[in-house]
Amino acid sequence: MNNLNSANKEFKNILKKRNMLSDTMGEDISESWIRCISTGLNPFKDPKQRLISSIELKQIKERNEALRKIIIPEIELLYSQIAGTNFMVAYSDENGLVLDTIYDKTCLQGDVGKSVIPGSIWAEKVCGTNGLGLSVELKKPTIVSGKEHFFIAHEKISCFASPIINYDGKTIGIIDASTDSKSREQHTLALVKLATRSIETKLFIKKFSNELILSFHPRSEYLSTTSVGLLAINGDGVVVGANTSAKIMLHGLVDLKNENFNNIFTNSFSSIASDLLNNKILKITDHLGSSVFVVKSQNFGESKIKETNTSNKTYACKSCKDTKIKREKCVLIRSTFLETNNISVASRKLGVSRTTIYKHIN
């Protein structure tokens, strides 16, 4: 209790010295600051950046290679979606160890690019309150903007982070976007969350590649989005996997894992299986009376996940080789097209016109 009282007193002193008001600070941020104070961090000194060796980093990357093959294309897409300059995107493991980064030239020369680098550890107990570290602690999306950072050295940075939650409910990584700009904060966080959901969906499909996967949502127009609930069902009609959205939407029912489909929904699995396998969208009701629309996402043994072979490098077309930004944009477009082999699908995925896609692949 004495330690907590001491930390609260020091918290107020720090706010006064930095001309900040506690009532303008969110609860998550203020609690993070108190944890930092209790750890012995001093916001008026430069943080002691902790880096692992290049050999260690290489070994950890190799151990996470299968996961990185799914994550890297998503952070490349996220980077292309964030408008403006001086932005960077990073992927860290579940402990806040940065493994991969993408940033523009302006960011590389600034505070963000020089400090958020592969091999750096951004856990809260090391770097104080920051977006990446706070998502590690809270296991939820976070924004830490400007003076909300515990260390004065980080005051010019805004961070947007979201955890990657695996099919078993465990946090397996963090996606973070950082900049020195304060504009479009909620928009940026929404894009970061979208990237993590897409990663989670791909991991779920990969894990249950031999099962029937059903997508469901209370609104039929959302069935093609990353906000859907996913259920993996075996040949006996038993649920063997459920994603986070499914658990939220079916909260209050039985424990989903290893539960028979018929104990979750009033429509028996055998009565709708034929229509589902024929790609029909059905409206079904759970045992609490809530209705959802459901459609087959994947048939038994029909995994749609394609491993990205990082050894087969995609190069920019001739007209895009004059600047780094042009090259990076072109490589992203060409690699996305090669992955999907469909101009329309690549256009929707990247949010650019089909004409733009066509220019870069011919």
Question: What residues fall within each predicted segment?
Answer:
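N-terminal sensory regulatory modules of PAS/LOV and PAS-like folds
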Residues: 132, 254, 261, 269
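Short, solvent-exposed loop/turn elements at beta->coil junctions and helix N-caps
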Residues: 147-151, 218
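PAS-family sensory/regulatory modules and their coupling/dimerization elements
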Residues: 147-148, 156-161, 264-317
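Glycine-centered loop/turn motifs
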Residues: 118-120, 256, 262
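Signal-transducing coiled-coil/dimerization helices and immediately adjacent hinge/linker segments
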Residues: 202-260, 323-331, 335-338, 343-344, ...
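Dynamic helix-loop-helix/coil hinge segments at AAA+ ATPase domain boundaries and subdomain interfaces
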Residues: 314-326
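Intrinsically disordered, low-complexity terminal regulatory regions
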Residues: 1-125, 133-143, 156, 165-236, ...
